[in-house]
Amino acid sequence: MLASTFSYRMYKTALILAALLGSGQAQQVGTSQAEVHPSMTWQSCTAGGSCTTNNGKVVIDANWRWVHKVGDYTNCYTGNTWDKTLCPDDATCASNCALEGANYQSTYGATTSGDSLRLNFVTTSQQKNIGSRLYMMKDDTTYEMFKLLNQEFTFDVDVSNLPCGLNGALYFVAMDADGGMSKYPTNKAGAKYGTGYCDSQCPRDLKFINGQANVEGWQPSSNDANAGTGNHGSCCAEMDIWEANSISTAFTPHPCDTPGQVMCTGDACGGTYSSDRYGGTCDPDGCDFNSFRQGNKTFYGPGMTVDTKSKFTVVTQFITDDGTASGTLKEIKRFYVQNGKVIPNSESTWSGVGGNSITNDYCTAQKSLFKDQNVFAKHGGMEGMGAALAQGMVLVMSLWDDHAANMLWLDSNYPTTASSSTPGVARGTCDISSGVPADVEANHPDASVVYSNIKVGPIGSTFNSGGSNPGGGTTTTAKPTTTTTTAGSPGGTGVAQHYGQCGGNGWQGPTTCASPYTCQKLNDFYSQCL
């Protein structure tokens, strides 16, 4: 993931001087603005379909926060440059500077209501803020850690107000639960202030990494007034559940050699921020499934099968080889629910790249056809992604524009110099001139995305064919009906092995189970050999 950053300049009105926490060589915390995390509920479900509400909270990433001198209001960071006196090096900067609390609605345009989070694109208060990145919290000092092997993750989303060039992204990264405080004692802010971010791009635009500033080698961006890159990056595995606007969407696993957060240096980081994209320890490209890119150009968009003019439900299943949470990740499946209808993910129409889910075989075939480097396999493939899912990952909800590639990799032709008829080039209907951040920010400042009704549970537990309430209610959850069918039911050819799928709406694979197993219907969209 890429993201815009935000520098909070001096408050225009005088503030009463408050005592600021700070001592030693450490990344500090300010007290001018109290940090109050907005509440957001989500649900955990059981195999029987019963769901329990959890009282979560969200926190905005540290990169968006005002960074000022300990003891007064002098900026440590203004625009896209560091104060050279306060920040001559990484350690001194961390000692001199404090992260401030956030006013979520007025400064960042982020609001919650019950189980929903709305992110506005451009918010103007004393300064103009562009986009945001927030994390789900377990409590005020700890991120919620989701372990998704042999589970499904479900949420509702409204992308109707996201035009070309924007990305409303919901995804998981293998951050530390405390934001790195226990590993790096100089980090005094921790998860409470949104520290510890990492992803598969090994981002070098972060102002603080591992309890120290990232000022050494900092180069201000040439096209982003708020951002730059430092010598260090922050790497970890990333599972992109949802990257989307109203035109295109993709889901993409990105494994790393080491699943958890590690700091990298210079171009050895790889990814978007380095001259050698594939020189790091993570897969910056991932293995994506974009329905348009896979050949179905009428599946997702305004008025299409999944109609982005209204809210819908997104279901992602993480299926293991043995049907347990300790198994090896073998498949990532996708369903949608809209207006009471379960919609299986579209099938890839390219010859030699079949299916509607992500597997190692799919990724190998897709990379070969599209002539992309198979960096996914190099860094562990599905097994590597599964290792991160097993240890637990943090939920990220964001909205951003793209100063590196104008989001054309998601919603247009990319690379722009290639023919749209070349396999893998066409990703959406947006023009290749679209997505320039300055244009998007000027023409669509009122863009927004809403995430809601998050549920996590065993396969088949978080939704049913009752689907979303188009009138704005939440997705209903009913107890799946379990029935047994005999082997040899009509359908696809071949035999499904133990724990394999053997039926469900849109299923075209085998419906016969290897002996002694039988095909058991968990719900309308999924039957399994048990």
Swiss-Prot record:
Enzymatic class: hydrolase
Keyword Secreted: yes
Catalytic activity entry: Hydrolysis of (1->4)-beta-D-glucosidic linkages in cellulose and cellotetraose, releasing cellobiose from the non-reducing ends of the chains
Predominant location: secreted
Feature: compositional bias, Low complexity: 475-488
Region described as Catalytic: 27-461
Keywords noted in UniProt: Carbohydrate metabolism, Cellulose degradation, Disulfide bond, Glycoprotein, Glycosidase, Hydrolase, Polysaccharide degradation, Secreted, Signal
Keyword DNA-binding (UniProt): no
GO CC terms, sorted: extracellular region
Region (Disordered): 462-492
Glycosylated sites: N296
GO molecular function, one term: cellulose binding
Coiled coil: none
Domain of life assignment: Eukaryota
Disulfide bonds: C502-C519, C513-C529
Assigned EC number: 3.2.1.91
Signal sequence segment: 1-26
Residues covered by region (Ser/Thr-rich linker): 462-494
Domain CBM1: from-to ranges: 494-530
Cell location: Secreted
Active site, renumbered: E238, E243
Pfam families linked to this entry: CBM_1, Glyco_hydro_7
Annotated family: Belongs to the glycosyl hydrolase 7 (cellulase C) family.
Function: The biological conversion of cellulose to glucose generally requires three types of hydrolytic enzymes: (1) Endoglucanases which cut internal beta-1,4-glucosidic bonds; (2) Exocellobiohydrolases that cut the disaccharide cellobiose from the non-reducing end of the cellulose polymer chain; (3) Beta-1,4-glucosidases which hydrolyze the cellobiose and other short cello-oligosaccharides to glucose.
Protein name: Probable 1,4-beta-D-glucan cellobiohydrolase B
Organism: Neosartorya fischeri (strain ATCC 1020 / DSM 3700 / CBS 544.65 / FGSC A1164 / JCM 1740 / NRRL 181 / WB 181)
GN (gene name): cbhB
